[in-house]
A protein has these predicted regions:
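Short, Lys/Arg-enriched N-terminal segments with co-localized hydrophobic residues
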Residues: 13-28
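Short conserved active-site loop signatures built around small residues
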Residues: 29-53
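Buried hydrophobic positions in well-ordered alpha/beta secondary-structure cores of metabolic enzymes
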Residues: 47, 87, 105, 119, ...
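Conserved N-terminal alpha-helix of the aminotransferase class I/II PLP-enzyme fold
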Residues: 58-107, 111-112, 128-137
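Conserved PLP-anchoring active-site segment centered on the Schiff-base-forming lysine
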Residues: 111-129, 147-148
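Short, small-residue-enriched loops and turns at beta-alpha junctions
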Residues: 127, 152, 172-176
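Short acidic/histidine-rich motifs immediately flanking catalytic phosphotransfer sites
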Residues: 159-166
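Active-site core of PLP-dependent enzymes with the aminotransferase class I/II
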Residues: 172-191
Length: 191
């Protein structure tokens, strides 16, 4: 037999949409719990506690051009949505984004910049990042400075009013140099 508190809780759960329950309890979760359950919302269709892996390619629509939240798995699906929520929960952020690769994430970030903007990056970064910066994004009038980020002075000397991004990859690839992220963040905010 359920206690009054348990009955009250069950009644409240039925009244409050799952997204709000998630918001209420996520702040009390510890890191390991957030990593696993932070993005979970009870499945309204089947009641699954953990999000299943959705492997469908397309979703049924109510009518042409009026989807119910998802259209194609290549753009988004419930599995990825909950993963992004879990990442946001771990980071205590409102939103999280997942990409198919690191270069896809870099591409999305760099595309928020405008012609004439300058980016300071480590001179020892992943070759794919370097080629993306030099061969693709310099064509869009972005200016990249590649410096030794282990020396904060070399970064500080280059920062100017056009600097919009300090790109840090640490540990670096291939040399495995470690950039002091805290000091780099302080330097960026100072300027």
């Amino acid at each position: 037999k359920l206690s009054n508190k348990e009955n009250d809780f069950k009644r409240i759960i039925k009244l409050i949409p799952n997204i709000f329950i998630f918001a209420l309890i996520k702040k009390k979760m510890k890191f390991n719990t957030k990593a696993i359950h932070g993005g979970q919302i009870l499945d309204p269709a089947y009641g699954s506690v953990m999000t299943p892996i959705y492997q469908t390619s397309t979703y049924a629509q109510s009518s042409p051009g009026k989807h119910k939240g998802y259209e194609y798995s290549r753009t988004h699906n419930p599995t990825r949505t909950n993963f992004e929520r879990a990442i946001a929960s771990i980071e205590n952020a409102e939103y999280g984004l997942a990409f198919a690769s690191g270069l896809a994430a870099i591409d999305a970030i760099i595309k928020t910049l405008s012609p004439g903007d300058e980016i300071i990056s480590t001179n020892d970064l992943y070759g794919g990042s370097y080629r993306l910066f030099k061969q693709i994004f310099e064509k869009y009038e972005l200016k990249f400075h590649f410096v030794n980020m282990e020396d904060l002075t070399s970064v500080e000397e280059i920062i100017n009013s056009n600097t919009k991004l300090i790109w840090v990859e640490t540990p670096t690839n291939p040399m495995m140099n470690v950039v002091d992220i805290k000091s780099m963040s302080f330097l960026a905010k100072k300027k």
